[in-house]
């Protein structure tokens, strides 16, 4: 199969499974796409899309988990934190490629906020707001963080 076609197919499948909330499957397809991209001159916007989707999938991976008790709770939160740090890595890679995309800064700021890394969250969310002043959700999250004293 043509490697460009294979890259795009894996990104598309990753997006479909992300939208269906099948985040683990989405991550698997996006991992394949990003592995293929290492040796190809891929369109930067498609590459950004792959990193952004993988970051979102990692953030939401364990969101719907039920029946957490006792020791499982600690493991759950450790896994969640790791997912958020991995998502931050993906958003950072995407920002390196396209530093003018306000949504990438928003998602990375949102991940930092979830980890209570408020200075980093505020920094990214302010950049997102500067890039797109009409993105009101950014303002809402900034107000929420500032109400906590940051």
How would you label these PLM feature ranges?
Residues 1-150:
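Alpha-helical tetratricopeptide repeat
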């Amino acid at each position: 199969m043509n490697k460009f076609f294979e890259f795009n197919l894996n990104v598309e499948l990753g997006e479909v499974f992300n939208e269906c909330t099948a985040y683990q499957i989405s991550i698997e397809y996006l991992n394949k796409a990003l592995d293929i991209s290492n040796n190809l001159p891929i369109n930067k916007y498609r590459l950004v899309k792959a990193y952004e989707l993988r970051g979102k999938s990692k953030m939401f991976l364990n969101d719907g988990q039920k029946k957490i008790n006792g020791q499982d709770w600690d493991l759950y939160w450790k896994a969640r934190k790791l997912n958020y740090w991995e998502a931050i890595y993906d958003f950072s890679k995407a920002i390196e490629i396209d530093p003018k995309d306000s949504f990438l800064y928003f998602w990375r700021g949102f991940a930092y906020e979830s980890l209570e890394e408020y200075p980093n969250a505020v920094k990214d969310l302010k950049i997102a707001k500067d890039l797109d002043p009409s993105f009101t959700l950014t303002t809402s999250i900034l107000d929420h963080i500032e109400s906590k004293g940051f």
